[in-house]
Amino acid sequence: PAGHKKAVQAANRAREAIDTAHRALQSCGQIFRYAIATGRTERDVAADLRGALVPVKRKAFATITDPAAIGALLRDIDAYSAGPITRAALRLAPYVFVRPGELAGAEWKEFNLEAAEWRIPAHKMKKRELHIVPLSRQALEILEDLRLYSGHTRFLFPSNRGNSRPMTKEGILAALRRMGYDKDVMTTH
């Protein structure tokens, strides 16, 4: 109904306004800290406003937790008629538990298949620490199959626009959406 749509739009605008206010306060704080460091002011007056803004309500990422639904998702991925690169990314994701950007940007040089591990360099990680991902037998099988398609390139999942860059994390998400899993049901994060 039209009333419901307007209520949802109003809620989204309010959430965006709160988010914008928090970002503006953060920017002001950075400006004042720079001004202090360069001798232009003595204190950060933006710090006085911390706690004055309504907190941003963070919503948990949607995920499937029901075992039967997880099984259905995995079957849908196996049956998905995407190209082999996208399908491999979707198939590998449940075995490695990394962020979509880390998966999409994975490079062959980061993998030691004999040791069954993926060593994600610190500069690629959100916390800037080396992250070692153990690889299961199933993950190794997916990687061996994938090597036929992208083993000659830098990236496991090269972009369809050229091998010199990886596919985007949005590409993985778009594949889930095409399979019918919208953002309220499943995210790749």
PLM region descriptions:
Residues 31-35, 143-146:
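Hydrophobic recognition helices of helix-based DNA-binding modules
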Residues 2-27, 37-106, 114, 125-129, ...:
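Basic, Lys/Arg- and aromatic-enriched nucleic-acid-binding interface segment
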Residues 32, 90, 173:
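Short glycine-/small-residue-rich flexible loop motifs, especially phosphate/cofactor-binding loops
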Residues 105-111, 188-189:
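A short, basic/aromatic helix-end/turn motif that makes direct DNA contacts
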Residues 121:
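Active-site-proximal binding-pocket segments
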Residues 59, 63, 125-145, 153-176, ...:
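C-terminal catalytic core of Y-nucleophile DNA break-rejoin enzymes
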Residues 71, 75, 87, 101-105, ...:
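Feature representing long, continuous alpha-helical segments
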